[in-house]
Amino acid sequence: MASLIYRQLLTNSYSVDLHDEIEQIGSEKTQNVTINPSPFAQTRYAPVNWGHGEINDSTTVEPILDGPYQPTTFTPPNDYWILINSNTNGVVYESTNNSDFWTAVVAIEPHVNPVDRQYTIFGESKQFNVSNDSNKWKFLEMFRSSSQNEFYNRRTLTSDTRFVGILKYGGRVWTFHGETPRATTDSSSTANLNNISITIHSEFYIIPRSQESKCNEYINNGLPPIQNTRNVVPLPLSSRSIQYKRAQVNEDIIVSKTSLWKEMQYNRDIIIRFKFGNSIVKMGGLGYKWSEISYKAANYQYNYLRDGEQVTAHTTCSVNGVNNFSYNGGSLPTDFGISRYEVIKENSYVYVDYWDDSKAFRNMVYVRSLAANLNSVKCTGGSYNFSIPVGAWPVMNGGAVSLHFAGVTLSTQFTDFVSLNSLRFRFSLTVDEPPFSILRTRTVNLYGLPAANPNNGNEYYEISGRFSLIYLVPTNDDYQTPIMNSVTVRQDLERQLTDLREEFNSLSQEIAMAQLIDLALLPLDMFSMFSGIKSTIDLTKSMATSVMKKFRKSKLATSISEMTNSLSDAASSASRNVSIRSNLSAISNWTNVSNDVSNVTNSLNDISTQTSTISKKFRLKEMITQTEGMSFDDISAAVLKTKIDMSTQIGKNTLPDIVTEASEKFIPKRSYRILKDDEVMEINTEGKFFAYKINTFDEVPFDVNKFAELVTDSPVISAIIDFKTLKNLNDNYGITRTEALNLIKSNPNMLRNFINQNNPIIRNRIEQLILQCKL
């Protein structure tokens, strides 16, 4: 049977290499290094909160407010607001694509009675009747859709800030209208958006659409007293394309210095590349249901040039504040459904942990100042096909969010071998076009980025930016600051084990029961158990050895030798003619039941306590006394074998821990029975006990004396189909005595027949056992 794997683990002898022992001890210990150079050693942060000082400007980072620029004519890029500062009455700007869009904005000063004024627009002299009875400036948006038509006033903006804005985005032209400080946006459609050019007659600024909230603030409230713009005086727009060469954005500055320590400021331009990770889990059954589509942390390593220096960088991307959605197409097994799929929206955050191999990250322990500035990036989702067995496949596609820099902190990210002191960049989100939908379902036009295909076929997303930090380092550059609590490879192994446990637990839904029963009948030895792993034969042998070394420290292995000796003692000292106290004393050598029982009665409490304790060790007795039936360990080993074959994360380092955990944790709620003539006595690990007749399944009183007599000699049988299931099966379907006896003995052929007949009661019981195989 499949439980041969556990017996083999318990009985096989093996040699222990001293090198392996040293390696194992080294991987399990965490070394603590304590230093006390100054008050800085008392915390990871400095004792005071100083400012970060100067953060040098850099053309790497796109400014929020770029300008001011001199009046000019050009074709503005899409997705950028043009913020125009009108300083006189008259024409502010003219914009056209010479096909279906002509618009001009004229400024009217306050307190103007109705009057006809001449304006030169697109080389033509036009007369408009204008007026303004308010204390604010009025901006009239004059529009026509053809060169043959006359202009008319399409929108009006009443403003005391004297700013107007225009944006090309999404096939439309957007402008502001209404009255400040509550002016809002509106749009006009056009069939030729890309060819729209603009002639501006005043100073203007350029703002990315990702910073539209700032543009709205400037329109309604004006610019702040001191604005961080690229220029001090208006420059020609051509200066925007000049490649600034400033060495100071990547520099090392000594802030202060003593004999042993110095404060260093590092300024760096960085390129952050990251990708989203996801997990898609399909339910068992007919293949129409999905249980989970979720985000997972994802690592990415890459190289890039910074001031001629080749930099190796490592990022880890994770999300926080996900929104759980679901779709239920109906109650039938063939109705498409998703129990849960995650979507990131405005209330979510994206974290990107960044590390590179430059000096800036070498001694990142005592940091007293940290600041950063990053560009925004748009992430657009792709398509994912739900491959159902019959019918047109539902397809989840679309969805988009824009990431905006929201802060930076220190962090630690884990690779397969080391841990890295990193910078965690936090991004807030805004939803963007297009929305996402699930084709062929009722789910349409929802906003956010679902986890089904967040990378949309892209290898990575990229953000440019810069950071500046100051920290305390040794004066001698050859020294490295000791980390107060060093992180060893063991923590990386724990992270791998955590991921593997999650994967193992999710695979329970994908195990077919008929295949499981067939697999449980095979004698799974060490080699066949691990042969499904993608590895060579030599590696398989090595993995088997590693598993045995780990398994010898398990609870099952440490108790088997004690149990073997105690069983023989119990059998020799058992007497059929003494009191129940004597019988329980005989078995107490391996059950520890009667140690604290001075006067055993037939009360339910005493029986329950005793049977609960005994049942915990029935597994050991069953393992050394083979029966012709199937055991819980057969199912455990079969599930373990199936999951090992299906796993994508199993490895030499993680397999020993997983096998050991499975031996101890798979199927925690077990029931065992002892059979005598036509009566069955059944107990479980929860302390419940039953006694019943095979023919009728009628319960009879549980005779603790009889149970005590049988427990040392009779074979212990796994109650795979427990009493409640048998009772339910007999009441609803009716079963013969032969069928009942075979089910009581956990006969594998009988189990397979019921499963092949799709008997819902038996299938449900086996499914419950599979779902108990979790770590």
UniProtKB/Swiss-Prot annotation:
One of its GO terms (biological process) is permeabilization of host organelle membrane involved in viral entry into host cell. The keyword Disulfide bond applies. GO terms for cellular component: host cell endoplasmic reticulum-Golgi intermediate compartment; host cell plasma membrane; host cell rough endoplasmic reticulum; host cytoskeleton; membrane; viral outer capsid. InterPro entries: ConA-like_dom_sf, Rota_A_VP4, Rota_VP4_MID, Rota_VP4_MID_sf, VP4_concanavalin-like, VP4_helical. Residues 483-517 form a coiled coil. A motif (KID motif) lies at residues 643-645. Residues 247-478 are annotated as: Spike body and stalk (antigen domain). The record marks R230, N231, R240, S241, R246, A247 as: Cleavage. Residues 65-223 are annotated as: Spike head. A motif (YGL motif) lies at residues 447-449. Residues 509-775 are annotated as: Spike foot. The keyword Coiled coil applies. Residues 388-408 are annotated as: Hydrophobic. Residues 247-479 are annotated as: Antigen domain. Keywords: Capsid protein, Coiled coil, Disulfide bond, Hemagglutinin, Host cell membrane, Host cytoplasm, Host cytoskeleton, Host endoplasmic reticulum, Host membrane, Host-virus interaction, Membrane, Outer capsid protein, Viral attachment to host cell, Viral penetration into host cytoplasm, Viral penetration via permeabilization of host membrane, Virion, Virus entry into host cell. Disulfide bonds join C317-C379. Residues 307-309 are annotated as: DGE motif. A motif (DGE motif) lies at residues 307-309. Belongs to the rotavirus VP4 family. VP8* Forms the head of the spikes and mediates the recognition of specific host cell surface glycans. It is the viral hemagglutinin and an important target of neutralizing antibodies. In sialic acid-dependent strains, VP8* binds to host cell sialic acid, most probably a ganglioside, providing the initial contact. In some other strains, VP8* mediates the attachment to histo-blood group antigens (HBGAs) for viral entry. This strain probably does not use sialic acid to attach to the host cell. In group A rotaviruses, VP4 defines the P serotype. This is Outer capsid protein VP4. It comes from Rotavirus A (strain RVA/Human/United States/Wa/1974/G1P1A[8]) (RV-A).
